[in-house]
């Protein structure tokens, strides 16, 4: 049994950091009160993580690039007719990545303009009219149910792969490696998860973190 590096370290760190921030934002908004400030921090962190993933989707390693897993309708139809165990994301999984980035990204952006009408306002709410704040707040509240559905489907897919297809996706996202026997391709490409790529990812992350800190903490006082 041969192990193949599929998911690079930056992609794995993004995945688990996003999961923790989503969990943190869900808990903090339900507790409410003073924890709404933490809800804002988690939301800003989610926005930064998604921005990082968008950039990494163009400059990252082989399986992290959007060009590797974002496919058109024909490829998706062909996959549904003849499913294969891809080394990286399948066309359906690639579509789910797009859905996650779009809906969680929109939720984070909407949160910047919302209010709970009690003690918390998003950092950008003061720059728009009350009418638009109400619209964004309602959209933010409605979208949370879509996000819950996305999370449920994601967890369901992981369980399906683990117990039905006998493929441990969670372990692969922890270690970065997949068993060659779990892939349909004969000679899968190994991701170049080396120091150069990791330094590049760190530079991108620090640049985003610095810009966000300046805008949201120093300028807006979030």
Where are these regions (language model features)?
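Membrane-embedded alpha-helical bundles that constitute the cytochrome b-like, heme-associated redox core
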Residues: 1-222
